[in-house]
């Protein structure tokens, strides 16, 4: 589990934002509480965490969104365990819904490059507790922009739709809102009959040595939702890579299967390739491949058990990685 930035009093800011909505429409408080472990080379790291999210509507056209994370990390050392604390405000943005086809976003937002950053980073959504090895490509070091964004559905029919997102971010060295000067966007076609989404992304770093990033994604699921495929490929100036992930609910519609229908076998394959080692971009320094095998269990009432085994290979050798976790997702109106 990688954390892009730290903010010592980020959660207080999150709560102060949340508290301003008393006189407004009912805000929603969502998020998760989790306890996860990672074992590598016989050493186990323990991480309890909470990841709250607030959505605060302000009338018919405005909304404020924010997500934070707080965790404690216990890392083994020669004498026992080191302990560290981490808290961060992942994003804090205001949305103006101008038309059914256009939403204007301002503030600190997750970069819409690819799909993983926006869709799968919440711990209650991702099947695996860590992101893909290639995910840092195109994320401008922090995965967060500070500035403006436009997004929406440009066209929609019974057979196809096209959605878009475009951003411009300023450079900021602020501890809570760390970002790089960049611009880019993403476009996606969705075919509801086939349950297929395909799209492409482009990003450009506009500070220091200017760099270009490109990406493409494909998501698909069967009609009953029992099998899902998610995949991305991305390329930057110094590295490129891909990942694809599948999950399967074998007894999705069979109530007679009892507790067995709640098991969810998973598989993820990922590779990264170095073009050079000029930049420190968060991608492994050597060509790396990794296979992840997982088995999740979905309890009633929004509780999941995550478990996975991974084998990672590179020129420096191979390593086994075991990960487990339990995640509870909560969602309720803050007040009425």
Where is each model-derived feature located?
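Bacterial N-terminal signal peptides that target proteins for export
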Residues: 1-9
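Bacterial N-terminal signal peptides
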Residues: 9-18
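Sec/Tat signal peptide C-region and signal peptidase I cleavage site
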Residues: 19-23
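Outer membrane beta-barrel
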Residues: 25-31, 35, 41-171, 179-181, ...
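Detector for outer-membrane/organellar transmembrane beta-barrel domains
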Residues: 27, 32, 61-62, 188-280, ...
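Solvent-exposed loop/turn segments connecting transmembrane beta-strands
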Residues: 39-46, 71-86, 140-145, 172-181, ...
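Membrane-embedded beta-strands of outer-membrane beta-barrel proteins
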Residues: 50-52, 92, 148-150, 166, ...
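Outer-membrane beta-barrel "beta-signal"
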Residues: 150, 319-336
């Amino acid at each position: 589990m990688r954390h892009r930035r730290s903010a010592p009093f980020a959660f207080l800011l999150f709560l102060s934002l949340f508290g301003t909505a008393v006189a407004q429409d009912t805000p929603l408080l969502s998020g998760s509480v989790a306890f996860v472990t990672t074992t590598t080379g016989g050493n186990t790291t323990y991480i309890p965490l909470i990841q709250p999210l607030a959505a605060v509507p302000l009338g018919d056209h405005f909304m404020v969104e924010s997500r934070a994370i707080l965790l404690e990390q216990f890392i083994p050392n020669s004498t026992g365990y080191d302990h560290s604390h981490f808290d961060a405000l992942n994003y804090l943005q205001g949305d103006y819904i101008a038309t059914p086809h256009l939403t204007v976003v301002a503030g600190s937002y997750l970069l819409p490059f690819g799909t993983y950053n926006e869709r799968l980073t919440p711990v209650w959504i991702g099947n695996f507790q860590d992101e893909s090895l290639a995910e840092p490509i195109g994320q401008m070091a922090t995965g967060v922009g500070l500035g403006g964004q436009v997004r929406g559905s440009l066209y929609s029919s019974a057979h196809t739709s096209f959605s878009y997102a475009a951003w411009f971010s300023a450079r900021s060295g602020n501890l809570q809102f760390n970002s790089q000067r960049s611009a880019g966007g993403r476009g996606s076609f969705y075919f509801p009959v086939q349950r297929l989404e395909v799209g492409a992304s482009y990003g450009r770093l506009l500070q220091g040595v200017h760099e270009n990033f490109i990406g493409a994604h494909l998501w698909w699921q069967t009609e009953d939702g029992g099998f899902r495929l998610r995949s991305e490929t991305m390329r930057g100036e110094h590295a490129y890579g891909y990942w694809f992930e599948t999950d399967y609910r074998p007894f999705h519609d069979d109530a007679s299967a009892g507790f067995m229908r709640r098991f969810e076998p998973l598989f993820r394959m990922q590779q990264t390739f170095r073009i050079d080692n000029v930049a420190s971009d968060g991608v492994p320094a050597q060509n790396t491949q990794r296979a992840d095998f997982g088995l999740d269990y979905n309890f009633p009432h929004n509780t999941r058990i995550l478990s996975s085994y991974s084998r990672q290979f590179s020129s420096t050798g191979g390593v086994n990685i075991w990960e487990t976790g339990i995640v509870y997702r909560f969602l309720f109106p803050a007040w009425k």
